[in-house]
Amino acid sequence: MITLTASLTALYVIPRTLVLDRLIGISGNLTFSGIITPVLGVFLAPSYGIFAVFIGTMIAAFIPGSAGTLKFGGLDFLGGALNVALISLLVRGRRTEATFMYVATLGLFIINPNTEIFVGSNFPSLPIPFQWLRVPSPPIPYLWLHLVALGVLVSPLTRNLRDSFSFGGRRGLAKAVLVVAFIGTMLEHVTGGILYASLFGSVALRSWPFVFLVYPFERAALVLGAILVCTPLLLASRDLIARFHLREAKTAQTRTS
């Protein structure tokens, strides 16, 4: 398990160094790290996955020219760690724990004094002839896509994911990657939002309208990247996945007996 964790940590470092987009309101970059989290979640139990993301984040932060510099006081690993942990829970059939984690994180975002449910009021007035342009929030809440992900999380789509990853065909595997990558990346996004609001305060309040407009496209790019990268990797590792999950099941059975 140590060797596997080290290997997947190294794998996580690679996309963590690559730029997806610039952050809004502060210096720094959003990286492509989310395109590989389904692989970590499938192979690693939550604790190992969190450890791998932590180490991978720290390594990437100190690689010259890396996009994965530390922007949130060293807590930058939290979003990716929760992403991997949630996927790991879902793959192992622990949907209740995954749902609690997701709902609790949404709650922490909502109660933060530097976040807003509807963000359109902070959108600046534009010059003529663009003064009519507005952010549609209200009526659309900032967390609209996160709520869609919550609906997917509690739906039948997250049942029997272990079988999809272990025995499903290419199409079924790609669908499973889509499901876990979407839910995981939305949890990672809201976790990043909590860090952003907590550390940058008024800057975050001014920035939410712009984040609202951009984040669906960024998340879509990460989910698409995860499908393209993780599906062939997991398909090629099908026998290894089955062996690891069988060993985990035997270990859990031994502990309960």
Region annotations inferred by a language model:
Residues 1-257:
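Loop-helix junctions at membrane interfaces
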